[in-house]
């Protein structure tokens, strides 16, 4: 969801990105209720590692959201999630490259239109 929230406003630009790179860090609470050696918080408290870097289960959802709402297709996308030494939270950085970069004003309008009352993008 965090990656989709970052990308959704950019659909309004009606431009197909050349490349999208999504870098996500997730806490141990997102790994589910069953403790495992790689996901249980006490065992990963001082660890930081990539999680399914080339075949993440949320990548199709991100592509589907963009394709359904934008009319264009995401053909060149990289999604890497890391398990961070956090209990809760997801931190996402999204890098979107266009052949002609949008102006700062265009970007602000897109994001404000989608999230007018939330300080999410401030």
Question: How should these model regions be labeled?
Answer:
Residues 1-15, 22:
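Alpha-helical support elements that line or immediately flank enzyme active sites
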Residues 18-122:
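C-terminal substrate-binding/catalytic lobe of Rossmann-fold NAD(P)-dependent oxidoreductases
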């Amino acid at each position: 969801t965090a990656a989709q929230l970052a990308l959704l406003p950019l659909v309004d630009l009606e431009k197909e990105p050349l490349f999208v790179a999504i870098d996500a860090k997730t806490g141990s609470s997102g790994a589910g209720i069953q403790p495992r050696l790689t996901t249980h918080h006490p065992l990963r408290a001082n660890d930081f590692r990539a999680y399914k870097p080339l075949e993440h289960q949320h990548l199709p959802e991100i592509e589907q959201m963009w394709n359904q709402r934008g009319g264009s297709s995401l053909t060149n996308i990289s999604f890497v999630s890391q398990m961070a030494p956090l209990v809760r939270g997801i931190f996402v950085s999204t890098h979107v490259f266009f052949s002609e970069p949008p102006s700062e004003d265009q970007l602000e309008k897109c994001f404000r239109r989608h999230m007018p009352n939330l300080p999410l993008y401030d």
